[in-house]
Every structure is written in C-alpha cells, then in structure tokens.
Amino acid sequence: MMKIDILASGSGGNAIAVRSGSTVILIDAGIARTKIERRLLDAGIRPDEIASIFITHAHKDHVQGLPLANKYRIPVFATEGEWKDIHVDQELRRSFLKNEVATIHHYPFTIKYFRTHHDSYDSLGYVVTEDNGDRLSICLDTGHVDSDMLEAMHWSDIYIIEANHDPELVAVSDYPDSVKARILSDRGHLSNQQTAEALARLVRGRGERIYLTHLSKSNNIPELALATVEAVLQRKGYVNGKHYFLEVV
C-alpha cells in the first residue's frame, strides 16, 4: 500500500517520500541533506533505501539537499536543461529529454511526468501509480493548470498540489512589484482559487486524499486555503470528510 511522507513543504524547501513495501522514491530534495536524513529516519526510512530521486525543477527549494544523492549513490531524474543548476555526480544523472514521454519503473511503482508552467527551464509534475492501481499526482510550482496537466492527473486517489497564495495578500505585501508580478504570472504559482478550480475538475468524490502544499508564509493563511477549496468543491456537492479528505501541509 502506498504511503506518503511529506518531509518538507514551502519556500523553505520541498521533499516528498513515496513508499510501498521496501521501495522508496523521493520527489524533490529541497532542504539540507542532514535535515532530509533526519526526517527520513523519523519516518522510519533509511536514506540508503531510496531507489531514485525525481526533481520537479532546479530552484533551490527543490534541490538544495541533493548531496544526499552523491552520499548514498542515488540516481536522480530531471529534465536535461535543469542540470546546469543541479550538482550531482555525472554517473547518477538520468535525463528526461525536453519533448520525450518517458515511463520509469521501480516495482511496485510506475512513474510518469507531465509539464508544468514555472519560471525554470522545464518544470515537471509526476504521477506515481502502484501496481495495485493506487495513483498519486504531484503538482508543485506552476502558474496555471492546463488541460494536458488535468488529463495527466485525472482519476488519481491522492493529490499533492500547491496552493501558494491569495492574490489580495500578494497585492498588499511588502514584496517588490517585480516579485508580485512573478508570483501572479502564468509561470509563477497557483493561487488558492486556481488550485480549487483545478481540483473541482479532478475530484470525483471517491474519497480522494488532497494535500495542499507550498503555501506562502507571507501571502497565504492555511484556513483561507482550506476554505477556498472547500467552497468550490461544495458547489459540486462534495463535502470534506465525506467525499474527499483535505488537509494543509
């Protein structure tokens, strides 16, 4: 049975461990290596058990812990253009080509990726399917959710998706105008409303588990993110705790 451990979430760093039986994969390694090691051990996972690390994109809050790969000789998957900002030994690098559609097998997992929209070379989301049919979609930094992304993520049992900000809080923040524009752009981050609207097209009321991640400490409030998603799903007749299960990480 698939088990999810969200080791870190937010602008300070992101890392997600996905495991079933003795197989463990890591999505992003965005906190210091020593912190990842400690949090893995707290979750009952030895770092040397990790089969592979899959990178969404090469911003610091997603890759700063990759010395973990060098220490434990863990293969790292990323798109080819991201390697200029990733410091991993050459023999551990596994590149996705820019226009390639690839499937990676780590029994009992099948891992596929889809393109997202962020201000990096070629950012990705991932869909992890267990051989029993359980399906996890991970969509972190992206400025919008398009139809291809929705198609890739549909019929998942678990969604880990960013709900980064509330636009009104961004507008009154102390951030420079250029940073505000970046956050709100189509290659920035999802607002609570954008996340809610995407989930409204994905959730089928089958008891899906939803984790809202990557919340901005300055431009969001957990209760606001929850309320926004719940309100949109309520319009479809779905109730949190009955038709789906929602929490903020």
Name these PLM-found stretches.
Residues A78-G133:
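Metallo-beta-lactamase
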Residues S147-V248:
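Cap/insert and terminal regions of metallo-dependent hydrolase folds
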Residues L26-G30, A51-A58, F77-E80, S137-L140, ...:
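Active-site neighborhood of phospho(di)ester-bond hydrolases with catalytic His/Asp-centered motifs
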Residues Q64-R73, V88-D89, N220-A227:
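Metal-dependent catalytic neighborhoods of phosphoester/phosphodiester hydrolases
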Residues G12, H59-V63, W83-D85, Y121, ...:
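Active-site environment of divalent metal-dependent phosphoester hydrolases
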Residues A102, H106-H118, E130-D134, T142-H144, ...:
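Conserved catalytic scaffold of divalent metal-dependent phosphoesterases
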Residues R33-A78, D157:
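Active-site metal-binding motif and surrounding structural segment of the metallo-beta-lactamase
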Residues M1-A43, L124-D141, I158:
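Conserved beta-strand hairpin/beta-sheet module of binuclear metal-dependent hydrolase folds
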